[in-house]
Amino acid sequence: RSRLFVKAVDGSRVEREEMVWQRALAEFRKGSPLCESPIERDLLAGLLTADWGYFHTENAVIHDCRNEEFPDEPVVIAPQLVVARYRLDFALVLRRGKITRTVAIECDGKDYHDRERDNRRDEYLSALGIGTIRHVGQDIHRIPLGCANEIAEGVAFWWEQFPQ
């Protein structure tokens, strides 16, 4: 926990960081039971503490697809969201201004993924306007926040490729 506060130098920043951390922890407690594997839980922790500044928010929030209305937040993480015939490890629903886009986040553990099947799935989702980002389970387990920050940077870059 103390590593999250390394950049904090003045009292107000420490307090703000503490609030951000508390919100991320509450969201993790809400989202963790929805995850189906340890690497998904690891990545969830990273996604909840990643740098989402491009989307003008400090925290992502969890959406439980089973029993909640969709929150009106800039970055929403929906674990196990069903899209047509697929269930995504995570759907990132991103809002900036009046524009909303969805990105599938897949945690590729060596036992459960087949490249050919994954490519078909990615093409299907792409036809629906949903991009896919994949991370290898070993990397997620080793550096979950690093993977999550790569995802945050990747979706910011991806977002810029669309006409506004």
Language model: regions and residue ranges:
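A sequence-composition feature that detects small, non-aromatic residues
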Residues: A8, A24-A26, A45, A50, ...
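A general structural-boundary detector
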Residues: K30, L34, I77-A78, Y112, ...
